[in-house]
Amino acid sequence: MALIILPFIGSLSVSESLVALITICVVYLILTYSHTKIPAGLQRLPGPKPLPIIGNVLEIGRKPYQTLTALSKRYGPVFQIQIGMRPVVVLSGSETVRQALIKQGEDFSGRPDLYTFQFISDGKSLAFSTDKVGVWRARRKLAYSALRSFSSLESTNQEYSCMLEEHICKEGEYLVKQLNTSMKANGSFDPFRNIVVSVANVICGMCFGRRYDHYDQELVSLVNLSEEFGQVVGTGNLADFIPVLRFLPSTAMKKFLSINDRFDKFVKKIVSEHYATYNKDNIRDITDSLIDHCEDRKLDENCNVQVSDEKIVGIVNDLFGAGFDTVSTGLSWSVMYLVAYPEIQERLYQEIKDSVGTERMPLLSDRPSLPFLDAFILEIFRHSSFLPFTIPHCTTKNTSLNGYFIPKDTCVFINQWQINHDPELWKDPFSFNPERFLSADGTELNRLEGEKVMLFGLGKRRCIGEVIARNEVFLFLAIIIQRLQFHMLPGEPLDMTPEYGLTMKHKRCQLRATMREKNEQ
């Protein structure tokens, strides 16, 4: 699901500066005098003038989503910047992005060959893959089939419609107990940490068929690895854009490689255990489902593209990492918004109380009767835009967009944050208002408005786990709102300023919660 590699702007070391000085004249001449020939009838891409070697990195700053939004107002929805020595096309505006990713989807379906991408999942990552379109499409189809098979897998417990629902409900109930226990012991809790562990457990159940105690060392290590990965990748790596830096010592790169290596070893161990115990008549989880689909492919003589066992590891790695980070970040932001808008929190509780009651746990089948909760989630996705960019795209051939020529193999950034805050698309875009996604009488979800929100990408590279992620956020939220009422700590203001990274997270804080009526334990 959604990531972005944008550089962290800091001062270069002495050795980096020396290398830059040695190459600056040659590279500057190349950048200055080598121009791509523009076909007749098309225009050259507009954009700010880059500096030699570093390009426009000084202009991008620490909040690239805002900087690039400001530049789109100056240059339009299609413009070019230069990060280091690599030209990057930035797309903004809903119509332009939909034209590129849906109507011209094949042209923009590639991934740029960034240096760091080859180290994610040992180069076998589905999300970051630079494989040829046919190979990538076969792997994506396999992953999608495995997800669909598992999400529809029947639960052994008749209370639940499927295994996914069972995993979420059981973990949601345990999360409520954990938060209540923390309140009794400490008087407050860290919403992010508790939610992260619960979501990780759901993902572990889905991918690996196992549930951990919240304090299990293996689970804690997985959570810590994911947080470290987000911090390191979120700050970016200039070596992706200034190739000469690849040959210089880098503490951040060493940490990045170490994190990937440790997680790969964990997933390989799990996949190996699954192969050893695999039973076609007993599909336990997504890993089993992937193995099952791969075995069917091996038996199919008409199948042109086979998927290696190593690439199964990459797919599992992607599904775990993306699903875990997106859902946990979305849920932790949800709790922050509940606290920031207590009147909305109370309205959500009343909707759940009226439609579901307090005697049983909410289920996925209750969703049609909880339109305000769905509207609340959509507004969180839009207002926070905690995934401000998609993973970078890349053009697969020479193409054009809005009358501008874009060469093959051009890196493309999709500014989702701009779309979600575009005043031409939204009334009062910086106001938090879930009602914008309801029908005029407030009784139904306005799905057409909801489709304008962009968080999971679009087109051929759209997140394959989107439906599962949305179901997770919905069900987790319904459960905790039904059981708990969240509050700020007295005298402590709530800081909703996002911290830029792999996904934009709120600052860590302490909150309070009280059990709702009929839920005292």
Swiss-Prot record:
GO molecular function: heme binding; iron ion binding; steroid 17-alpha-monooxygenase activity
Function as written in the Swiss-Prot or TrEMBL entry: Cytochromes P450 are a group of heme-thiolate monooxygenases. They oxidize a variety of structurally unrelated compounds, including steroids, fatty acids, and xenobiotics.
GO BP annotations listed: hormone biosynthetic process; progesterone metabolic process
Record keyword Mitochondrion present: no
Any one of the GO CC terms: endoplasmic reticulum membrane
Subcellular location, principal: endoplasmic reticulum
Record: residues binding heme: 463
Entry protein name: Cytochrome P450 1A1
Localization, UniProt: Endoplasmic reticulum membrane; Microsome membrane
Cross-referenced InterPro entries: Cyt_P450 (IPR001128), Cyt_P450_CS (IPR017972), Cyt_P450_E_grp-I (IPR002401), Cyt_P450_E_grp-I_CYP1 (IPR008066), Cyt_P450_sf (IPR036396)
Leading EC class: oxidoreductase
EC number: 1.14.14.1
Catalyzed reactions: an organic molecule + reduced [NADPH--hemoprotein reductase] + O2 = an alcohol + oxidized [NADPH--hemoprotein reductase] + H2O + H(+)
Species whose genome carries this gene: Opsanus tau
Gene symbol of the encoding locus: cyp1a1
CDD domains found in the cross-reference section: CYP1A
Transmembrane segments: none
Keyword field: Endoplasmic reticulum, Heme, Iron, Membrane, Metal-binding, Microsome, Monooxygenase, Oxidoreductase
Membrane topology qualifier: Peripheral membrane protein
Family: Belongs to the cytochrome P450 family.
Domain of life of the source: Eukaryota
Binding site for substrate: 229
Keyword Ribosomal protein in annotation: no
Cofactors required: heme
